[in-house]
UniProtKB/Swiss-Prot annotation:
The keyword Nucleus applies. The gene is SPOK1. The lineage of its organism: Eukaryota, Fungi, Dikarya, Ascomycota, Pezizomycotina. Keywords: Coiled coil, Cytoplasm, Nucleus, Toxin. Promotes unequal transmission of alleles from the parental zygote to progeny spores by acting as poison/antidote system, leading to poisoning of progeny that do not inherit the allele. May possess DNA nuclease activity that leads to spore killing, and a kinase activity that confers resistance to the nuclease activity. Can suppress meiotic drive by the P.anserina SPOK2, SPOK3 and SPOK4 proteins. GO terms for cellular component: cytoplasm; nucleus. This is Meiotic driver SPOK1. Residues 457-468 have a biased composition (Basic and acidic residues).
Length: 734
């Protein structure tokens, strides 16, 4: 080989070596990039990264069915409050949202606090696999794509001490769908003292500790939104911060949202069109009018919930948009609305769209939640006072506000069309008189005859509302008459508010002594108020006590009476109240329920009578049943009418209480020996009482009565009892 050829070969080999080196470098760079990508995909994300991922992979994953295959029907709003005016919520857009977005961004900074991008992508894949054509599908989407991320961000704020205090960021959760706010129910009411021989025999053979776990359904108001934002208070209570409702995406058409919500008299126009049964001949105008009607009805439904649940904040979630709502309690007739349309506001993703992340659904709903935390929900007397004002100033669908001029179409564009005509508006035009409103709230001169929605079966899946708003508002009006005339307004009513119970609960020994006619309990924290004329005896007997409580609540259901926790202390048939009898200072609890559940309270009273000699030790002291003439108002415009009076049993045992199950079995055996099968194994029904150093059992509305067991049978069921002297060391959860 010549020198020339050898040189050429060496040059080729050198080039090949260089190429191999370059390939190796490129391969290493690619592997490094892939490794970094995987690390980025699987590491936790920053606040802004999380917003970007939620919008890109979750919000954009929503796929809607063709409208022809979507659920049909209207939102049921007849008899519900609706506002006179609709105005832009500019304070949220210009002040509140920028402030809270900057706050969250400052607190989170560049810390990697949120789920990895891979997790968000995987969830987005699941979302995109399902077409959304009805409210149930929107429900699932909103939970996964919006509510879950919002809750994750608020959880970070709640753990930030400075922000938690300054901006009132509590522990928070979106409620489950209130129509499904249940534990499973086996369908047994428990109100019958008798049971079949076979069932009774099986229960007696099994004993008190071997029956199947009870499944119970929790009571909910008939006026139920799809969800409630629940905030947990430091003391353990729970209050509502806002109300929300889901709507199928085609019910809140995004192409009409901005124009519809910009109309100050939207509600008046829609109500007038429906009442007059006027249709435009123009098909395009018909579609716009139908879209406006659906939007107005969706807003009305949430507005009514906001009023009756005592909150100033609410929103409509419809997949492609959120309608964020606010009501100023100084102006009930105006609803403020901020339409959130992320697809338009954020736009298509680019390499750097950080400046638009504040417009994502998650970011805006976080700011909405923080805004709502600054406002307290109305409850009890303040709620009734506010609802009396609302009842006097607001109209209900389909009544008209007399002083609003109808800004409708020109006569040439309108035609009077029968509701049987095959047009869009016929779906929500009246054919019949409204049902459920049998008492007028206002004079007939102020109310125009109203067209209403048909009472057929063409309703939304989740819009079934079996309440009778007329009946509830009639009670509200009657309550105001019973209070008598007031020379002032709402502020005066609040200033004259009835005193709430403030004292510690009386002891079991105190209230048992009252019931049995024995001496005062010197260990009761309220004994100084019980003692009259230096006597060691109770100043009243049990019968007089119950009568005095009845008379006190007859004057006002809020005098010395306060609901303990509407969301946390609700059971299968009622709510817990704290009461104080003036001037004797007796402080105890009441189990309140609605008018149609009296039989279950009476059944529970019979169970307590069977357990008479166990009262104050194994079960609370039962002090009778009273009726509240006016009723204690609840969120959702329900009224507690009956109340069973009892001693306070205690608190839920802490997780560290090792012998809780043993103590529970002892108490169950004790009531079983008296012929009572508790029938409800819910953990909340077994409370640690530090005074008696044992587990006390409550809630006997599902209990079954049977003949008491003979002593020999009792001894077989009983186990050796342990000394209770050292049980006071157990901690309770406060």
């Amino acid at each position: 080989m010549s020198d020339k050829d050898r040189i050429a070969q060496l040059l080729r080999e050198l080039e090949e070596a260089k190429a191999r080196v370059e390939e190796a470098k490129a391969r290493e760079a690619q592997e490094r990039c892939e490794k970094e990508r995987l690390q980025l995909e699987h590491r936790k994300t920053t606040f802004l990264e999380y917003l970007r991922n939620c919008h890109r992979h979750l919000y954009n994953a929503l796929r809607l069915t063709d409208t022809s295959r979507s659920s049909t029907g209207y939102t049921k709003v007849v008899g519900k409050y609706y506002p006179k005016r609709l105005r832009p919520w500019t304070n949220f857009a210009n002040v509140l949202h920028p402030r809270y977005f900057d706050l969250v961004q400052k607190i989170c900074g560049q810390r990697q606090l949120f789920e990895p991008a891979s997790t968000t992508k995987n969830l987005g894949t699941i979302i995109s696999d399902h077409l959304a054509g009805n409210e149930k599908a929107i429900d699932r989407f909103e939970v996964d794509a919006v509510e879950r991320p919002v809750q994750a961000i608020l959880k970070v704020l709640a753990t930030h001490e400075e922000a938690g205090k300054a901006y009132r960021c509590p522990e928070f959760r979106f409620s489950a769908n209130l129509r499904e706010l249940t534990q499973e129910d086996d369908g047994s009411s428990g109100a019958d003292d008798n049971t079949s021989d076979g069932s009774l025999e099986r229960r007696q053979q099994a004993g008190p500790n071997k029956r199947p776990t009870s499944k119970r359904k929790y009571i909910c108001s008939n006026r139920q939104p799809d969800g409630v934002g629940i905030r947990m208070q430091p003391g353990g209570g729970q209050t509502q911060a806002f109300i929300y409702d889901y709507k199928a995406a085609h019910k809140v058409a995004i192409e009409h949202v901005r124009s519809a919500t910009a109309k100050e008299h939207l509600f008046h126009e829609v109500v007038a069109r429906i009442n007059d049964n006027k249709l435009s001949r123009d098909k395009e105008v018909q579609r716009r009018e139908q879209a406006e009607a659906f939007i107005a009805m969706a807003l009305t439904q949430v507005f009514d919930y906001m009023i009756t649940y005592g909150v100033s904040y609410g929103y409509v979630a419809a997949g492609r948009c959120l309608l964020l709502l606010y009501v100023d309690r100084d102006d009930w007739q105006t609803l403020y609305c901020h339409p959130c349309l992320p697809a338009d506001d954020v736009g298509e993703p680019t390499n750097d769209w950080t400046d638009r992340l504040s417009h994502t659904a998650v970011a805006q709903l976080v700011s909405f939640c923080l805004s709502s935390f600054q406002s307290e929900a109305l409850e009890g007397q303040s709620l009734e006072t506010a609802l009396s004002v609302a009842n006097a100033t607001l109209k209900t669908w389909s009544e008209s506000y007399a002083d609003v001029a109808y800004l409708g179409l020109e006569p040439a564009e309108l035609s009077s069309a029968p509701s049987s005509q095959n047009t869009d508006i016929s779906e929500y035009t009246s054919k019949a008189k409204p049902t459920g409103r049998n008492v007028a709230l206002r004079s007939q001169s102020s109310c125009k005859p109203a067209a209403v929605l048909p009472q057929g079966n063409e309703h939304d899946e989740h819009d079934e509302d079996h309440s009778e708003p007329g009946a509830s508002r009639s009670r509200l009006a009657a309550n105001k008459r019973k209070r008598g005339p007031s020379s002032g307004g709402e502020d005066e009513d609040i200033a004259m508010a009835d005193p709430e119970p403030t004292r510690q609960y009386c002891t079991q020994a105190c209230l048992l002594g009252l019931k049995r006619g024995k001496d005062l309990d010197e260990n009761c924290p309220n004994v100084s108020l019980h003692r009259f004329d230096g006597s060691s005896r109770h100043p009243v007997n049990a019968h007089r006590f119950t009568d005095m409580v009845k008379q006190q609540l007859l004057l006002s259901p809020y005098k010395g009476c306060r609901m303990v926790d509407f969301w946390g202390k609700r059971g299968a048939m009622g709510w817990l109240f704290k009461l104080e009898l003036f001037p004797y200072g007796y402080t105890f609890v009441g189990k309140g329920t609605l008018e149609d559940r009296l039989s279950r309270l009476e059944h529970e009273g019979r169970v307590y009578a069977r357990l008479d000699h166990l009262q104050g030790d194994v079960v609370p002291v039962h002090l009778g049943l009273v009726r509240l003439d006016r009723g204690y108002i609840l969120p959702g415009l329900e009224f507690v009418v009956y109340m069973m009076l009892m001693s306070w049993a205690g608190q839920t045992p802490s997780a560290s209480m090792a012998d809780a199950e043993t103590l529970k079995r002892e108490s169950l055996t004790a009531i079983w020996s008296e012929g009572v099968d508790h029938g409800d194994d819910n953990r909340a029904n077994y409370l640690w009482n530090a005074e008696r150093c044992r587990i006390m059992i409550i809630d006997f509305d599902r209990a079954r009565l049977f003949p008491p067991l003979k002593p020999r049978a009792v001894s077989r069921l009983s186990k050796p009892k342990r000394e209770r002297g050292n049980r006071s060391r157990h901690q309770i959860r406060t």
